[in-house]
């Protein structure tokens, strides 16, 4: 077998493979004999059909089968011989196979990039340091009160921020109603910013029974391209205003927050402990993002187009599934194939490069994890969704799932690698409030 490789740029390779005529003839003869033994034709005993007739009736399919077999045998061998690692499947340029002649074909491939990480030790990093304050705890308690608030209908009272309004509305652009711009008995908490900027502000002060027009401009980056940047008028009819009444901070509220014993003080203590854990988690995530950002800045790399295209397809598929779960059709929001690609192209490149860099660092620095590290990641997930006997069942189920187990192993190895990179860096502590830390994450 002869193998010739032509480089067409950084990643593109044309591999021309020639299989000797002797092997071609041997396989043709073997396949012909096999077909003759199996075929049944009227007037001939089994295995006695003339070779010429076999050739006339089945020659094309036999040659196609032999060509396929020759490719399956020779292509992996050629890759191994030349030390090539292809991205995806090859694009084949096949010539028709003929008896007595060598079989030659060309496989067009893209090869995996070889990334040699640099400047990954000694990175300058900032570690957020947060001390949980009483005010942070009170903020959470306020949210608990808001979540357990009761609403009472108010007659003749002007709506204020925090009130709940029930109203009908219909939107118009250039005098024409648009799809998705109409609703009846819609319930909205004023000040929640669920609508486009300026909409809710114009509802404040309205009373039950009022009819009013709300004038807004859709943002330039609004997800429905037919509405982006356009002025709209919403005709609204207010049906009811309900004011919010917050419950007292007492033992009953503590129970609603999941603290069955110890009352208000126990609730505050539990909230404090939870915020400490949350701050630690967010701080670690923040440092991880710093590490990733610096790795990308220090290691710019080109990538094969097939690799990027595949990653974009995976990311788009995941996004579409998420929209589907929410009952949203992305096409109705103006998403096109080009929109999807533009949205994920850069993220896809970064994800691939980071994966290659991290893998290379793991290999160079001989970083390893044990089963306990994997188990810790499984436990962390199980604790979020289950307790008691069901938690044990879920854990056992996850450990039997090879694909999920590999995901946990990958997450554990990534965590260890990031921790190692942080240890090799220069870390400066920076005091932050809990609010600042969380806002930075968002």
Swiss-Prot record:
It holds the Pfam family Trigger_N. Its EC number is 5.2.1.8. It catalyses: [protein]-peptidylproline (omega=180) = [protein]-peptidylproline (omega=0). SUPFAM superfamilies: FKBP-like, Triger factor/SurA peptide-binding domain-like, Trigger factor ribosome-binding domain. PROSITE patterns: FKBP_PPIASE (PS50059). Keywords: Cell cycle, Cell division, Chaperone, Cytoplasm, Isomerase, Rotamase. Residues 162-247 form the PPIase FKBP-type domain. GO terms for molecular function: peptidyl-prolyl cis-trans isomerase activity; protein folding chaperone; ribosome binding. It is found in: Cytoplasm. Belongs to the FKBP-type PPIase family. Tig subfamily. Consists of 3 domains; the N-terminus binds the ribosome, the middle domain has PPIase activity, while the C-terminus has intrinsic chaperone activity on its own. NCBIfam families: tig. This is Trigger factor.
